[in-house]
Regions:
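N-terminal cap/lid segment of alpha/beta-hydrolase-fold proteins
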Residues: 1-51
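Conserved alpha/beta-hydrolase
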Residues: 66-69, 74, 78-98
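Short beta-strand element of the alpha/beta-hydrolase
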Residues: 54-63
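Catalytic active-site module of serine/aspartate enzymes centered on a nucleophile-bearing elbow/loop
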Residues: 294-331
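Alpha/beta-hydrolase active-site loop
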Residues: 104-124
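Alpha/beta-hydrolase-fold enzymes
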Residues: 138, 142-228
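Serine-hydrolase catalytic core
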Residues: 193-295
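Alpha/beta-hydrolase fold nucleophile elbow
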Residues: 125-137
């Protein structure tokens, strides 16, 4: 669905950020109640297509129970010569305001419609000829599935702690997945737990200014506790993670970044501020081999799950690693 007639409006981040609503086809079985996504970018990006501010661009995909607010990440890309765009997917973030069940998406491929439209806007309307897809956590899984399904649409992938497998032992993953698959067919809206889900509350407390952290995001859009994990959502995630394990054959260069250490729900706030308490970094590293033939893995000491929200030294190392890699791979 083309959104060429949709105007830009001031974004919640304030100037120079603007938001553009992307209407999408409703899908009651895959993303009930969701009818739009929101593309966020700086006002200067929407200049004449013949003369974009930067020829290269990045499209950022957020994680579960998340939205785009990391303006320092955007600034790092802008300073490196990339226009920055972020897509709050249907039922998520800005596009989930007023939604009965935010982030209740049972097949991530339903997001293909808004990703396709965002890329059309970036390339055709705004005139960028090189586009990088940057995904965090669930957004990282979204990014690799998109790149595998739609070769030639993006020029590189940057993955920030991508969710490539379910945390836990092989036994937990096998039996847990079978149970979730069965439950999702009977009651996809059933709220369930998952290994690691409790860690996210400790994670938020370690990062948000209300508790012990540095950051001040909107807790209505990225709450603590996080939005419920539902059976339909997790079953959909597991289907795609199995595809990853079978091999995706992505044909563009991929950078996978993650912390050096994982921790559990029992981690102290201090430990949560310098490790990944959501995913297993060893799993991330192992599953990265199935993405394609050109994969670079970079671990960030004392990085948190969203590496862009790590402490100052780890954050700087992550951003520097990304920009150096892009400079090396995209001449």
């Amino acid at each position: 669905m083309s959104a060429t007639s949709e105007p830009t409006t001031p974004d919640i981040l304030g100037e120079p950020w603007v938001a553009r609503r992307i209407p999408v086809t409703e899908s009651p079985t895959k993303a009930p109640g969701a009818d739009h996504a929101v593309l966020v970018f700086q006002r200067e990006a929407a200049g004449r297509a013949s003369r974009p501010r930067h020829s290269r661009a990045v499209l950022y995909l957020h994680g579960r129970s998340d939205y785009f607010f990391q303006t320092h990440l955007a600034q790092a890309y802008l300073d490196a010569g990339f226009e920055f765009y972020a897509l709050d997917l249907r039922a998520c973030g800005r596009a989930g305001v007023g939604h009965a069940s935010p982030h209740d998406v049972r097949d991530l491929r339903v997001h293909d419609e808004e990703i396709s439209e965002a890329l059309r806007i970036i390339r055709s309307e705004h005139g960028h000829d090189v586009v990088v897809l940057n995904g965090h956590s669930t957004g990282g899984l979204q990014a690799v599935i998109w790149a595998a399904d739609h070769p030639g649409t993006v020029d590189a992938l940057v993955l920030n702690s991508p969710w490539l497998d379910l945390r836990g032992s092989a036994l937990v993953r096998s039996y847990g997945s079978a149970f979730v698959d069965l439950l999702s067919r009977r009651d996809p809206e059933r709220v369930i737990g998952e290994p690691g889900s409790g860690d996210e509350d400790n994670y938020v407390a370690a990062l948000h200014r209300r508790w012990r952290g540095e950051w001040d995001w909107d807790l209505a859009l990225k709450p603590a506790p996080s939005f419920p994990v539902r059976a339909g959502f997790l079953a959909g995630i597991r289907r795609l993670q199995r595809e990853v394990h079978h091999g995706l054959g992505i044909r563009v260069p991929i950078l996978v970044c993650c912390s050096t250490v994982s921790n559990s729900v029992k981690a102290t706030l201090e430990e949560a501020q310098r490790s990944d308490v959501v995913l297993d970094v060893e799993q991330i590293i192992d599953r990265s081999q199935y993405l394609g033939d050109d994969v670079t893995v970079r671990q960030i000491p004392e990085g948190v799950h969203d590496l862009a929200l790590s402490g100052p030294l780890a954050r700087a190392e992550y951003l520097q690693a990304v920009m150096r890699w892009l400079d090396n791979r995209l001449h």
